[in-house]
Amino acid sequence: MSATATVATTPEGIPVIILKEGSSRTYGKEALRINIAAVKAVEEALKTTYGPRGMDKMLVDSLGDITITNDGATILDKMDLQHPAAKLLVQIAKGQDEETADGTKTAVIFSGELVKKAEELLYKEIHPTIIVSGYKKAEEMAIKTIEEISTKVSVNDTEILRKVALTSLSSKAVAGAREHLADIVVKAITQVAELRGDKWYVDLDNVQIVKKHGGSINDTQIVYGIIVDKEVVHPGMPKRVENAKIALLDASLEVEKPELDAEIRINDPTQMKKFLDEEENILKEKVDKIAQTGANVVICQKGIDEVAQHYLAKKGILAVRRAKKSDLEKLARATGGRVVSNIDELTSQDLGYATLVEERKIGEDKMVFIEGAKNPKAVSILIRGGLERVVDETERALRDALGTVADVVRDGRAIAGGGAVETEIAKRLRKYAPQVGGKEQLAIEAYANALESLVMILIENGGFDPIELLVKLRSAHENETNKWHGINVYTGQIQDMWSLGVIEPAVVKMNAIKAATEASTLILRIDDLISAGKKSEGKTGEKKESEKGKEED
């Protein structure tokens, strides 16, 4: 039921209004039905993008900016969703993306399927609490199954890591260049991975991504160092410095203006000359101080005066100005240097080291490359592409691929894709359900059906008959040795996905299942939807005027 205001009555029958005027309340089955409809609507929007043969979405914002993508997190982020249940799915997707960098569509679509199956059980008068309990038991069995069937992988298994990257990239718009991009991803992750105790750790902040419009996706390259998207400030400076000693400055190489307003009265031209000479001496002293430390490269976050540029060039020092703060922080980690805020405090111990600093022309722009840094746990990926939208989509694809390969390295477990895991879990859930018995059995079977719905969507997006292939896939999984059998969405054949190279991180699948189960059970538990009334502009204006009057009094 729904109502525009909540009204209670006293024993004498006198009505008591609880909510403000304009508020609305929907409760009981009607509230559940509305929430389920909202979740299903979001799922429908993402369904066609699922899998390597999924379609793309064109999203146009209020300013007319266009985004073409099939990245689940990006689509949901760009959609201006209003319903609270739909917003909940966006939060689930963001959490999944931040946690594992992939599996957002799996989490959202699976949430939608779980809610759909629950709706069917609700029509059979099965209470939501029983459905939630059954779903939780099914989730535990699903996670246990993945842990049992997953395969151990180490950072040295580069071929498996490459297949993980290829699997992630195959569903993106950049699939045509996936071989080249997969190699870059694996090289980047194996470079920055480090062993801490008995576990591998990957800090993706050590992988810098720089975008530059022009060329093609196949021109994308990995650089074992840091790229500063700036050019050398003075034409007289060297464009290449070997055995670079790098000063990282968070201070300007300019004459600082006084904080207070000050006037200088000049009575004759000689005083003016003295004033300018003094400014020049201040800048020269700053440059001399830098040179005394042995620095031959300066990366400055702030400005560099033309006079300072001249003196730096005379001393053969390569300088870059207006560098990003994040670039300075990355350089500090990579080169072993320290960012200094006061040039007078700069010493030789603050300098970073790199074997090569060089300015290179990329397309129409010049960039500074710092390679062979003291700490090798820092790499950069320079993305190229003919269109800006292609470059943006390549960045999204690379971030997902980097995240999935990093997940495998950190967790050390991988599984096959192509619907193999979902089918295997569904098979085990159907055997497990009768052991639980009662109405919960129906909820566990519904959970299994929801998992298989993911497989059917995968098949459907590949252009094949989902019912026919799902029956064949179920039959294949009856044999215990066929746990990795799934759907080849390019041929429509049932094949061993592991042998085919369709490999995914186990942790991504587990997180997606947990997130989807949590979201669906949360929605099923809601039986009351209370919406506050919107403030009218008139009332808001009157309130502001009254507040203003009080302030004046």
From Swiss-Prot:
Organism domain of life: Archaea
Annotated organism of origin: Sulfolobus acidocaldarius (strain ATCC 33909 / DSM 639 / JCM 8929 / NBRC 15157 / NCIMB 11770)
Annotated PANTHER family: CHAPERONIN (PTHR11353)
Family: Belongs to the TCP-1 chaperonin family.
Gene3D superfamilies: GroEL, GroEL-like equatorial domain, TCP-1-like chaperonin intermediate domain
Subunit structure: Forms a Heterooligomeric complex of two stacked eight-membered rings.
UniProt KW keywords: ATP-binding, Chaperone, Nucleotide-binding
Record's protein name: Thermosome subunit beta
Pfam families on file: Cpn60_TCP1
